[in-house]
Amino acid sequence: MTNSIVNKVTGDIFDTEVLPIIPKDIKKVTKWQFKWAKELPFSEVYKLVVVGNPNILQGLIAIRDEKTHYYMALIENAPFNIGKSKIYEGVPGNLVAFACKKSFDKGYEGFVSFDAKSALIEHYEKTLGAKRAGRGSLMYVDTQAATKLVNRYFK
């Protein structure tokens, strides 16, 4: 179980869990930015949901086991969790912490890599503790940052 997401309006805190996506979930992501059905053959896809309410997807993550670390292919907030009018905060942090936890569980020391949009590189450095791998868009979460994320988001 992950620690929580926070309702931005009321301040209420909700326990969450990360579950594998099931086929009926794909029908619910038609208005999302990414084409999640196309990712299923290549990645493990998981959903973040409020405990006891698995039918409302708060966010999704697609990860791939690269045998030395996990690669985060996609991550996305639900449309209602984007922008200034978003309902819940904490969705992406929960999902990245989940990927880090899986990396620890596989013996990869928490390492997770991903390609970042250049406009978000600084944001990921601040919020996730991610680092750039060279000058390009490839970033990674190392053991130290992964430990902080897992400790923050997992009970």
For each of these PLM feature ranges, what is it?
Residues V91:
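Short beta-strand-alpha-helix junction that forms the catalytic/metal-binding core
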Residues M1-K86, N94, K101-F111, D115, ...:
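Non-catalytic substrate-recognition and accessory regions of acyl/acetyltransferase enzymes
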